[in-house]
């Protein structure tokens, strides 16, 4: 058996389609959210575009996130997507914990997961986050053996969902028993081919009799 998990950052509008596809294939997913960057009742539909696609990632309205992510795991990505090692350590941790508290209150369940904004972390922030009650911190580094982490606050994934080595990384991960991929749903923008490629990954993984979908938090429990 191989445990497979995925996570998606930032609470953007394209997450709606990710959720739909995950439900279609009974796939689990964790969504890393920034509560402080959402409007209360209106979606954010204007702003910086993703690369040269003309696609605006946007943000879900806060009053819809509970229904959109119903049945899925959520994790802290900080209230305001601050960068560890750039802002004061205590301010960074306070921001991360504030998001944790908001998510726990809003979703009515424990939230001990974290994804490092920009993939940045320091030994000091790892220790402080651990003391603050976080169970793991996802980085943007890759490893062939996710399960053999030395510090769960520096939890590396197997690959990014759009990397050309996706299936090679999956096969390399089989001996370890864990395959973990991540991304941003806006990276698929409105491109049918990219969405089809993602759906094909979900289908192939879900049809593999050796695959068991899990949440990221399950890797460190």
Residue ranges and their predicted role:
Residues 18-22:
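Histidine-anchored nucleotide/phosphate-binding helix
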Residues 1-17, 93, 97, 104-107, ...:
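C-terminal active-site subregion of NodB/CE4 polysaccharide deacetylases
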């Amino acid at each position: 058996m191989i445990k497979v998990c995925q996570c998606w950052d930032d609470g953007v509008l394209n997450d709606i389609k990710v959720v739909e596809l995950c439900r279609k294939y009974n796939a689990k997913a964790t969504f890393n959210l920034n509560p402080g960057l959402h409007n209360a009742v209106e979606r954010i539909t204007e702003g910086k575009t993703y690369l040269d696609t003309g696609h605006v990632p946007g943000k879900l309205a806060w009053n819809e996130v509970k229904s959109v992510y119903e049945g899925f795991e959520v994790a802290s990505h900080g209230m305001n997507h601050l960068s560890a090692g750039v802002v004061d350590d205590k301010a960074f941790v306070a921001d991360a914990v504030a998001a944790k508290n908001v998510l726990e209150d809003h979703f009515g369940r424990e939230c001990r997961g974290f994804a490092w904004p920009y993939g940045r972390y320091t030994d000091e922030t790892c220790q402080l986050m651990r003391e603050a009650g976080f169970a793991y911190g996802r980085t943007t580094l890759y490893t062939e053996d996710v399960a053999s982490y030395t510090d769960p606050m520096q939890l590396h994934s197997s690959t990014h969902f759009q990397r050309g080595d996706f299936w090679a990384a999956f096969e390399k991960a089989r001996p370890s028993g864990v395959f973990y991929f991540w991304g941003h749903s806006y990276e698929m923008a409105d491109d049918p081919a990219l969405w089809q490629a993602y759906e094909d990954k979900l289908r192939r993984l879900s049809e593999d009799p050796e695959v068991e979908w899990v949440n990221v938090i399950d890797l460190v429990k």
